[in-house]
Amino acid sequence: MIRAIVFDFNGVLVDDEHVHFELFREVLASLGVPLDEAAYLDRYLGFDDRGAFSAALIDAGRDAPPAFVDELIARKAARYAEVAEAGLKFFPSAAETLAGLAERYPVAICSGALRAEIEYALRRLKVRDRVHSITSAEDTERCKPDPEGYLIALDRLRANLPDLEPHQCLVIEDSLAGLEAARAAGMIAVGVTHTYRHDELERAGAAAVVGGLGAITPGWVAAKF
């Protein structure tokens, strides 16, 4: 029986995976490091900004000292803030699905995004008050596919549900690395075909795959799991 819901953020609620790719590519290009979208999806999508920049620099034969990576993260974050201010794009039914699930379950966010980006988007969606807790890039040392973020989210949900078990948490993910992280944490994961194909999400271990957030209602969750 499902007792809590954990949403990924980018690519699930906010339609900005392409924005992150373009900004990531822009910052790397200023260093003379090329990046195409296929490589981004295959290699870097599951990382938080720190992990993605570090891996990209190392893959290009460059050093990745923490202070320099911090500078790159700050540059990308500043550009993302400009884009967000101009108008974020949300997936259809994002607000309705989150709010509807929150009527029956505690809802958490677990993402490699920066906390300020998550908070801003949730306020724009007018659902910040429906979210129990947020686990962001600042809270973790290891990014997806490592389960650390989801285990932190579980621990925070236990503030209200002390006996909550991992298999009682339903994760909503768009990425292969995210599905791997959720499964490694012992949680059940649903894949949404916002970024990867149905068959790719199935092969990554999604317990169910849906074409959009509107399919994920409290009744669907109760009947399916």
Model-derived features with residue positions:
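Residue-level detector of anion-binding/catalytic polar loops
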Residues: 34, 106-107, 188, 207
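Residues at secondary-structure transition points
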Residues: 15-18, 40, 44-47, 67, ...
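Short coil/turn residues that cap or connect secondary-structure elements
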Residues: 32, 48, 61-64, 109, ...
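Generic serine detector
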Residues: 30, 54, 93, 111, ...
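N-terminal helical cap/lid subdomain that shapes the substrate entry/recognition surface
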Residues: 2-95, 103
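Asp-based, Mg2+/Mn2+-dependent phosphohydrolase catalytic module
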Residues: 1-3, 99, 115, 119-225
